[in-house]
């Protein structure tokens, strides 16, 4: 603050009074007063819930590793690179590995995701932006119902209803594009339904209903503003709806991938077992992590046999964590780009 010059007094100059200094106000994120007992209890409960979730995840991983180590110590093969038949009956010389399980799990999940997400995007945009209200409501209910159907129903439907209908398409793809490894003849007849092709389509149906609500949350004011500026309906969707729902679409895609990675009952019913190595063909059979463990559930009375399958479960657990971490990173990156 600058003091006025005494020489200016009486000289006809207007002297402004000095402005008072603004007081510094500290802001307490928990309020201006001391947190009460109820506030402290709520904070402890919230922190405890977060710690409990982390502790449960760590406990699951530790349990799986603890049960798997004895079996891994008796394994005569490289657990990560062996893809042959599992031999766990002789616990003194066990042979098991996850290479084939990992390949089948990732392949069928990515195939299902590639089929499901474009369809899910189209369904979501149609229901939220184009369909009349009297039609959008019932259709949205039917789409959401896809996520509520039990897996065993999908499995039976896929094997006995969908697979016979896919036989002509499978035969045509094999005949026309059989030179490509993706459509080459697999480990069994192409016209049988127990293949990755059938299982992936069933998985795609199961994970379709993951993005509809994301696009339904777009501000209607933004859409109306775009239309008022002369944009067509598609231009409004492209400039407002799609950018708004991009992050949710990415996270929904990874959520669908996570569900596909862990799907058990439907694929256990559909996929045929095989003793051949996985050839990366859509017309191969095989086992995923989940179906391998579920199929051997009745033989897990021995700690070493159980340990072999729990080791596979540990790998599936870690794979799921990695996928979720990638989803989180992609979601954060997409939001930053959008901003």
Model-found features: residue ranges?
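Membrane-cytosol interface at the C-terminal ends of specific transmembrane alpha-helices
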Residues: 121-126, 181-228, 232-235, 240, ...
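Membrane-interfacial helix termini and adjacent extracytoplasmic/periplasmic loops
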Residues: 74-99, 155-205, 283
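Glycine-rich helix-loop "coupling/hinge" segments at transmembrane-helix boundaries
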Residues: 259-302
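Transmembrane-helix boundary motif in ABC transporter permease subunits
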Residues: 112-143, 327-336
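Transmembrane alpha-helices
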Residues: 141, 145, 149, 153, ...
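Transmembrane alpha-helical segments of polytopic membrane transport and secretion proteins
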Residues: 1-49, 327-339
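Periplasmic/extracellular loop-to-transmembrane helix junction in inner-membrane transport proteins
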Residues: 26-45, 65-112, 132, 186, ...
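C-terminal transmembrane helix and the adjacent membrane-cytosol boundary/short C-terminal tail
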Residues: 212-223, 227, 254, 295-339
């Amino acid at each position: 603050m600058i003091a006025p010059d005494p020489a200016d007094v009486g000289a006809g100059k207007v002297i402004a009074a000095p402005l008072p200094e603004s007081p510094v106000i500290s802001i307490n994120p928990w309020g201006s007063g001391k947190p009460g007992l109820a506030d402290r209890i709520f904070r402890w409960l919230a922190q405890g819930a977060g710690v409990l979730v982390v502790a449960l995840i760590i406990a699951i991983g530790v349990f799986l590793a603890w049960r798997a180590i004895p079996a891994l110590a008796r394994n005569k093969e490289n657990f990560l690179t062996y893809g042959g038949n599992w031999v766990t009956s002789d616990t003194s010389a066990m042979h098991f590995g996850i290479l084939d399980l990992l390949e089948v799990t990732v392949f069928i999940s990515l195939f299902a995701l590639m089929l499901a997400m474009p369809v899910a995007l189209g369904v979501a945009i149609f229901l939220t932006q184009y369909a009349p209200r009297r039609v959008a409501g019932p259709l949205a209910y039917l789409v959401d119902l896809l996520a509520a159907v039990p897996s065993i129903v999908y499995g039976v439907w896929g094997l006995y209803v969908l697979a016979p209908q896919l036989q002509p398409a499978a035969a045509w793809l094999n005949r026309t594009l059989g030179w490509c490894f993706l459509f080459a003849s697999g480990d069994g007849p192409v016209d049988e339904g127990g293949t990755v092709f059938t299982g992936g389509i069933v998985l795609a149906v199961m994970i379709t209903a993951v993005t509809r609500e994301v696009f339904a949350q777009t501000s209607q004011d933004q859409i109306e503003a775009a239309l008022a500026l002369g944009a067509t309906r598609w231009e409004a969707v492209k400039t407002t709806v799609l950018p708004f729902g991009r992050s949710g679409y990415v996270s929904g895609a990874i959520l669908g991938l996570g569900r596909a990675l862990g799907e058990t009952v439907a694929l256990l019913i559909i996929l045929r077992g095989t003793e051949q190595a996985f050839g990366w063909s859509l017309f191969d059979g095989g086992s995923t992590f989940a179906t391998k463990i579920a199929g051997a559930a009745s033989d897990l009375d021995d700690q070493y046999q159980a340990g072999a399958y729990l080791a596979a479960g540990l790998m599936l657990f870690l794979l799921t964590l990695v996928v979720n971490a990638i989803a989180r990173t992609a979601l954060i990156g997409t939001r930053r780009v959008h901003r």
